[in-house]
Each structure stands twice: as C-alpha cells, then as structure tokens.
Amino acid sequence: MPRYELALILKAMRRPETAAALKRTIESLMDRGAIVRNLESLGERALPYRISSHSQQHSRGGYFLVDFYAPTSAVENILEHLARDIDVVRPNIVKHPLTQEVKECDGIVPVPLEEKLYSTKRRKK
C-alpha cells in the first residue's frame, strides 16, 4: 500500500468538537482500509482567504496532517467522504514523497577563470 498524507482544514471549533471531528475522520480512514501512522496538529489560524464550504463562509480553521497507508482504490472514496463532512472545510490527499538516498555534495567545481575572462582569439596588431 502506498503512503499518503492528508492535509485537512477543519472549521474553527472548540476543543471537544474538534477532537470529535478528528476521531470521526480517523475512524472513516480506518473503515476504508487505511493504516494511520501519525496525526499532527498545526494549530488554528486565519485562513489565507475566505473559504465557502457547506453554505458557510470560513475565515479561521484548524490545520491538521494525517500520515497514512491506504490502497490506491480507496483514496477517491476517502476524499468523497471527507468532502461531505460538515466540519471539514478543505481535505487534500497527496502521495507521500518517497524517502530517497541523499547524495553528498561534491563541493564547488573550480572553473578556469582565464578561459572565461580572456578571449582565446588573437588580437590584430
């Protein structure tokens, strides 16, 4: 199963309502075959612009990241379910970037300045 990341914006609510909405979201992921690795809260803050969702205008929201594994066939179903949730302002699922081996930098390659600064053509005398 591929690894995904759910970027989730919930409408501004008090802590118990936010916890209930997150619990409902995580349970819906697991009901659709996902394995949740991590849930990270990025805090509540002002949205960059007013977002209209479920006939309401939102200017503040809670930002959350959910790291999970899921079958590729379930991702579209998960997004459809989250779009119908009245507490979710904006759901977005992206494929988690694969961890790649980091290559060490070779450093700065010296450039011969004489070739760059001086013309190789001969001057007329």
Curated annotation (Swiss-Prot):
Keyword terms, alphabetized: Mitochondrion, Ribonucleoprotein, Ribosomal protein
Keyword Nucleus: no
Predominant subcellular localization, coarse grouping: mitochondrion
Segment forming the signal sequence: none
GO CC annotations on file: mitochondrial inner membrane; mitochondrial small ribosomal subunit; mitochondrion
GO terms, biological process: mitochondrial translation
Iron recorded as keyword: no
Molecular function as annotated in GO: rRNA binding; structural constituent of ribosome
Pfam families xrefs: Ribosomal_S6
Compartments, as annotated in UniProt: Mitochondrion
Transmembrane segments: none
Domain of life: Eukaryota
Stated family: Belongs to the bacterial ribosomal protein bS6 family.
Subunit description: Component of the mitochondrial ribosome small subunit (28S) which comprises a 12S rRNA and about 30 distinct proteins.
Xref: PANTHER family: MITOCHONDRIAL 28S RIBOSOMAL PROTEIN S6 (PTHR21011), SMALL RIBOSOMAL SUBUNIT PROTEIN BS6M (PTHR21011:SF1)
Listed name of the protein: Small ribosomal subunit protein bS6m
Organism this protein belongs to: Mus musculus
Gene: Mrps6
